[in-house]
Amino acid sequence: MASLRLFLLCLAGLVFVSEAGPAGAGESKCPLMVKVLDAVRGSPAVDVAVKVFKKTSEGSWEPFASGKTAESGELHGLTTDEKFVEGVYRVELDTKSYWKTLGISPFHEFADVVFTANDSGHRHYTIAALLSPYSYSTTAVVSNPQN
């Protein structure tokens, strides 16, 4: 149990450090950003396919945005402030394809993060995931938009 707490503390610290660094052009205005790290190799997880869905009033999921993580393990520019309205969203990381390209047979097909966004006013969200072939952990940093 203590090792799990230490692991989660380290993950939260990593997200904090990545958020505290200098923002590049456009990054500070990105309302939804995804960061994926490979726990086996200790590096950013590159080319992870990411799909974002928005829950409809009927309860089904409609495609909202998609992309792949860059060399930094980050995916920016998924949406705009105007499109990222209050609602329930699902971020789906294609973990199986990522591990298969590395020659590893993983347990999970996907890693999903489901969350309510902007219910307390407009915010910016960083969803961070730490992947290994048989587990994953996620956390989020929710902040006020920077002008």
Curated annotation (Swiss-Prot):
Its main location: secreted. The modification Sulfocysteine is found at residue 30. Pfam families: Transthyretin. InterPro entries: Thyroxine_BS, Transthyretin/HIU_hydrolase, Transthyretin/HIU_hydrolase_d, Transthyretin/HIU_hydrolase_sf, Transthyretin_CS. Gene3D superfamilies: Transthyretin/hydroxyisourate hydrolase domain (2.60.40.180). It comes from the Eukaryota. L-thyroxine binds at residues 35, 74, 137. Residues 1-20 form the signal peptide. The modification 4-carboxyglutamate is found at residue 62. Glycans are attached at residue 118. GO terms for biological process: negative regulation of glomerular filtration; phototransduction, visible light; retinoid metabolic process. One of its GO terms (cellular component) is extracellular region. Belongs to the transthyretin family. This is Transthyretin. The gene is Ttr.
